[in-house]
Amino acid sequence: MGKNFLLEIGTEEMPAHFLDPAIKQIYDFSLNYFENQKISFEDIKTWATPRRLVVYIKNLSEKQESQEEEIRGPAAHVGYKNGVWTEVAKRFAEQYGASLEALYIKETPRGKYIFLKRIKEGVNTLEILPDYAVSLLKNIRFPKMMKWGNVDFYFGRPIRWIVALYGSEEVKFEVAGVKSSRYSRPPRFLPQTPIEIKDADSYIDLMKENYVIVDQNERKNEILRHIKEIANSNSLTLSYDEDLLEEVTYLVEYPTALLGQFDSKYLTLPEIVLIVTMEKKQRYFPLRDKEGNLINKFIVIRNGTENYKEVVIQGNEKVLKARLADAEYYYNEDIRCPLEKYSEKLSGIIFQEQLGTIKDKVERVRILVREIANILELSTEEKEILERAVDLYKADLGTLMVSEYPELHGIMGSIYAKISGEREPIPQIIGEYIYPRTLEDQIPKNPLSTVLGIADRVDSLTGYFALDLFPTGSEDPIGLRRISGGLLRLLLETDFKLNLRNLFMKSFEVYKFSDKCPISQIEKGMLFIGQRLRNLLLDKYPNDIVEAVMEVGYDELWKLKRRVDFIREFKEKDPYEKLKRALNRLYRILPKDFSPKEINENLFNSPFEKELYRDYVKINKEISKEILKGNYKVLLGYDFLKEFSDHIESFFDHVLVMSPNEEEKLNRLSLLFAIKSLFWEVLDWSKLN
């Protein structure tokens, strides 16, 4: 039999982005804790609101399972002599209430010892729960931890109350000066009269009666239901970011949706300005008409009931009006000057204290863009377009709008470039180079935008690598994981024949770093990039394929992507298993540090090795050039591979590779090495399952 267990940690308001990671940690910790403690349960639920973190464990067993434990006693030579248990052994048995018949001798790394087994009765769950709760609270990590008062304890926000109930029984403990009890608190918008919770079973319904929907999924569904009702009843359509819904869910405990509006004159502002103002600044849901046009209405989610809703609506409308009036002012002021004028301000904006100004960055990126343009053999016109785009791509950082709305960098630059009369595709490049910013974003449509995006990210990463500003643990204040993820996607999802390591080396050269920033930091940076790349690939492809292609290098990502595409297709072909088996046999026999010699055909005396050499010459002549150019799919239609695989097997079955004749041995190993070198140019076949 079991009882339901409830733990509610009441806090001051937590930032919305703290909560989802926190409840995932709570779930994982709880699962591991009770499994390790051998306490069974039916299910674990974790919930969060701005003011409470909750774990609810259904049907938690009242007692640990009994466990058999093996106890080591004295050394055998002390406790067992001449076939008889000694007094030492008898005392050992008596100490644990066991008979002499229960003793046995067992070999250990330290010699032979006397052992006995006994059944250890499980402890009552109620006695274990205080340790669980305290350990849990000490183990939860937040993006920022804080300490309050004189208490030597860190948490996301100060803990103000704790509810801990096992069935109807209180679980007594103290953390951060707060004692557990059965009393919760209502939401902030109600008088703070404690809510007595009689038992864990009644918690959810009782909190709902007190205007707290504890389950975040239920809150999210309530928000969706309310906003859809408002939109449908007004013949409107919703327009919102999924992240906004997630954030608002964690900002309220009892959601109520209200419809507000703003002056239609603000609809003349760029749509993105209105959306960012409503979604990012105010957490409102924008609305559109049936044709998809943004309109001057919005939905706000209130934390509370519909009481005084007109006052709440008016208050939100007033705040939004002030925001939009500011945005209108910034926009009108900005468009008084051409975008180019704002480039003059970039020498006064710091990119990074040790890496110079934005103006410095622009000039470094210009050199990288030229380098990439030459490698890709772009036309004179394309190079001229890129030069102009580089002139302007950071200019909007000097505008009022982007100073207030940094997330609109690039987007406003594109809008202002059009207003300034810049010819296409320059505005498009300025607006697209920032993408992808997330895993969900598409890469730019214009290849020239991608060129600028690559150069910009390479410059940023090179600077941060040189200064050793790598992320530590979950902390990544600069956003290197995001920047590198964007760079990798740009290179993986295009077929640009670029060498990433060479780009970093060129960028390092452009920076003109002092000796305090050694070039070895680029190697460290490439390792960081490699780990990010591995993670990206593992989200889409099997582990063996990822390891096989990563092992042969990732400097040229266009080749890596082609390797992945090739092996995914080749695995379904007939020659795959035979070739993989033959190549792995070859791989295993080659010494790790083998240095090949020039192959001497005259030293081959077996028909099997002569045949294999002829195969190698044939393959080298017919497809090696294509393989070296990255055209790996040439192997897909190469019918000779099955026969070649048989010849490798025959070679191993009939030829003694490690001949006592040193000259013969080196010649045979050199042939195998040549074959390996050719096929390992494609991938590391030894990594494939």
From Swiss-Prot:
It is an enzyme of class 6 (ligase). One of its GO terms (molecular function) is ATP binding. InterPro entries: DALR_anticod-bd, Gly-tRNA-synth_bsu, Gly-tRNA-synth_heterodimer. Keywords: Aminoacyl-tRNA synthetase, ATP-binding, Cytoplasm, Ligase, Nucleotide-binding, Protein biosynthesis. GO terms for cellular component: cytosol. Pfam families: DALR_1, tRNA_synt_2f. Coiled coil: none annotated. It catalyses: tRNA(Gly) + glycine + ATP = glycyl-tRNA(Gly) + AMP + diphosphate. SUPFAM superfamilies: HD-domain/PDEase-like (SSF109604). NCBIfam families: glyS. Belongs to the class-II aminoacyl-tRNA synthetase family. This is Glycine--tRNA ligase beta subunit. It comes from Dictyoglomus turgidum (strain DSM 6724 / Z-1310). The gene is glyS.
